[in-house]
């Protein structure tokens, strides 16, 4: 049996109260792991590990399908998605399914189809998972050498990496094809308040696309989270999809160079740690993207961002009081600064009051009212459209606030008018998941490095000096 860990130093960290328990024919003595260590018992059983992974994929897809249908069953077309606690239908709507101008849902049938397709797929994956876990060969190397592997086989590992990259690249291109050729995608920046449109001219300039990568993640720079138009989103997927596919082909056709062979730890647990680190980065990125970005996460479906809700409140009262005769350009607030409008330190006309901190907010309902130097006073007096007023009034009362006990909204409001924004759910969950995946990355990286050095199982407790010392009492 090919052992990943040295049997010479086989001192178990896990101290079981019942070390003789045998589950599935694999006990702690034969595998080096207790029953509750799960897939670690299958490190050298490629067939069984395949079953575990396929079954896991089945569970993921089953949740997607079941939750999709649950949201469809509870969906009320007259209410915004973000008022209904939905997190899957907004993603489908963002892809352009079932929605029309302004993000209005005109057909829920595509959502039903999506749920059913995921459920059917989960059944196939579930069957495959059970088959490979219970019936299929324990190891694939003998029967299916193409699918077999040894963790230390550097060439095989990079070939598997290449296959994964090609699949990921194909996934990125699926979004490109959907946006360019198969019905288009929802664009919150479309004139008149958002609409589904074909992205016929995606950004392919490397200078534009890679400038996002080189931006600072701090302050107003925002790294890739600052993307603010669909052309750049789809162009970015063209680049990442193409790079993944060519990178995958490269890794399939080549062997690791000497520096890579020396730099990396080549073991199953090391690959797990690399994966967890990558997923942690994705989790933190998704957290920021879902919280701040209104292009990839349109406010029509996910609710307004914090700055957006704040700006929309001042805009709403500006509209109201202007109708009542207020001179919004010169009215002073309680601090002596402009009540409705003021100048930023660099001279732009911005909303006054507490929302001045969000002066750099950009949103499709507000941008038409800007001029060359911030907000345009003439447009604010003469060009505000009814849809902009309605949108701002709706966003004003749906700030992405929330708390651990799921009572959302402002603390001074009764629960009946409160809600928890999908942005709150998505940002919080992805931050927490990203954090725990990062901890897992550190944990498994440490174990993998220790295993490579030959002391992964700790010291021999039988020889500890403390065992020969007298009791404290």
UniProtKB/Swiss-Prot annotation:
BP GO terms, sorted: photosynthetic electron transport in photosystem II
Alphabetical UniProt keywords: Acetylation, Chlorophyll, Chloroplast, Chromophore, Manganese, Membrane, Metal-binding, Phosphoprotein, Photosynthesis, Photosystem II, Plastid, Thylakoid, Transmembrane, Transmembrane helix
Record Pfam families: PSII (PF00421)
Cofactor note (record): Binds multiple chlorophylls and provides some of the ligands for the Ca-4Mn-5O cluster of the oxygen-evolving complex. It may also provide a ligand for a Cl- that is required for oxygen evolution. PSII binds additional chlorophylls, carotenoids and specific lipids.
Coarse class of the protein's main subcellular location: plastid
UniProt membrane topology term: Multi-pass membrane protein
Subcellular location per the Swiss-Prot or TrEMBL entry: Plastid, Chloroplast thylakoid membrane
PTM sites of type N-acetylthreonine: 15
Sequence positions that bind [CaMn4O5] cluster: 367
Gene Ontology CC entries for this record: chloroplast thylakoid membrane; photosystem II
Proregion residues excised on maturation: 1-14
Residues modified as Phosphothreonine: 15
GO molecular function: chlorophyll binding; electron transporter, transferring electrons within the cyclic electron transport pathway of photosynthesis activity; metal ion binding
Record-annotated membrane-spanning stretches: 69-93, 134-155, 178-200, 255-275, 291-312, 447-471
Description of how the protein assembles with itself and partners: PSII is composed of 1 copy each of membrane proteins PsbA, PsbB, PsbC, PsbD, PsbE, PsbF, PsbH, PsbI, PsbJ, PsbK, PsbL, PsbM, PsbT, PsbX, PsbY, PsbZ, Psb30/Ycf12, at least 3 peripheral proteins of the oxygen-evolving complex and a large number of cofactors. It forms dimeric complexes.
Family to which the UniProt record says this protein belongs: Belongs to the PsbB/PsbC family. PsbC subfamily.
Its job: One of the components of the core complex of photosystem II (PSII). It binds chlorophyll and helps catalyze the primary light-induced photochemical processes of PSII. PSII is a light-driven water:plastoquinone oxidoreductase, using light energy to abstract electrons from H(2)O, generating O(2) and a proton gradient subsequently used for ATP formation.
Protein name: Photosystem II CP43 reaction center protein
């Amino acid at each position: 049996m090919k052992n990943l860990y040295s049997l010479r130093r086989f001192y178990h960290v896990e101290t079981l109260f019942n070390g003789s328990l045998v589950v599935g024919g694999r006990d702690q003595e034969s595998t080096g792991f207790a029953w509750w260590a799960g897939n670690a018992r299958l490190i050298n059983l490629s067939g069984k590990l395949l079953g575990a992974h396929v079954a896991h994929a089945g569970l993921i897809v089953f949740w997607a399908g079941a939750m999709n249908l649950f949201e469809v069953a509870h969906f009320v077309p007259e209410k915004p998605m973000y008022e209904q606690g939905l997190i899957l239908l907004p993603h489908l709507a963002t892809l352009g399914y079932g929605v029309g101008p302004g993000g209005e849902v005109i057909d829920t049938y595509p959502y039903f189809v999506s749920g059913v397709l995921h459920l059917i797929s989960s059944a196939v994956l579930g069957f495959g998972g059970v088959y490979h876990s219970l019936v299929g060969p324990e190891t694939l190397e003998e029967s299916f050498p193409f699918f077999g592997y040894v963790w230390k086989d550097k060439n095989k590992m990079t070939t598997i990496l290449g296959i994964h990259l090609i699949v990921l690249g194909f996934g990125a291109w699926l979004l490109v094809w959907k946006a360019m050729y198969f019905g288009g995608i929802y664009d919150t920046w479309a004139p008149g308040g958002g609409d589904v449109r074909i992205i016929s001219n995606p950004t392919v300039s490397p200078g534009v696309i890679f400038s996002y990568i080189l931006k600072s993640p701090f302050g107003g720079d925002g790294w890739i989270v600052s993307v603010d138009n669909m052309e750049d989103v789809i162009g970015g997927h063209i680049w990442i999809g193409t790079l993944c596919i060519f990178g995958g082909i490269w890794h399939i056709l080549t062997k690791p160079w000497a520096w890579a062979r020396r730099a990396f730890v080549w073991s199953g647990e090391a690959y797990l740690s690399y994966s967890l680190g990558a997923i942690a980065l994705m989790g933190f990125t998704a957290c920021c993207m879902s919280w701040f970005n209104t292009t990839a996460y349109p406010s029509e479906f996910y609710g307004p961002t914090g700055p957006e809700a704040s700006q929309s409140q001042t805009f709403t009262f500006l509209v109201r009081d202007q109708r009542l005769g207020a001179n919004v350009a010169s009215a002073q607030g309680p601090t002596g600064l402009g009540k409705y409008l003021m100048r930023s330190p660099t001279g732009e006309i911005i909303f006054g009051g507490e929302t001045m901190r969000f002066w750099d907010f950009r949103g499709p309902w507000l941008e038409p009212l800007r001029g060359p130097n911030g907000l345009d006073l003439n447009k604010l007096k003469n060009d505000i459209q009814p849809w902009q007023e309605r949108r701002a009034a709706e966003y004003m009362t749906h700030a992405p606030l929330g708390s651990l006990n799921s009572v959302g909204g402002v603390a001074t409001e009764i629960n009946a008018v409160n809600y928890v924004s999908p942005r709150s759910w998505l940002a919080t969950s992805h931050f927490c998941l990203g954090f725990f995946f990062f901890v897992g990355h550190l944990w498994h990286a440490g174990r993998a490095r220790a295993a490579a050095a030959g002391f992964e199982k700790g010291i021999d407790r039988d020889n500890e000096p403390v065992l020969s010392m007298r009791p404290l009492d």
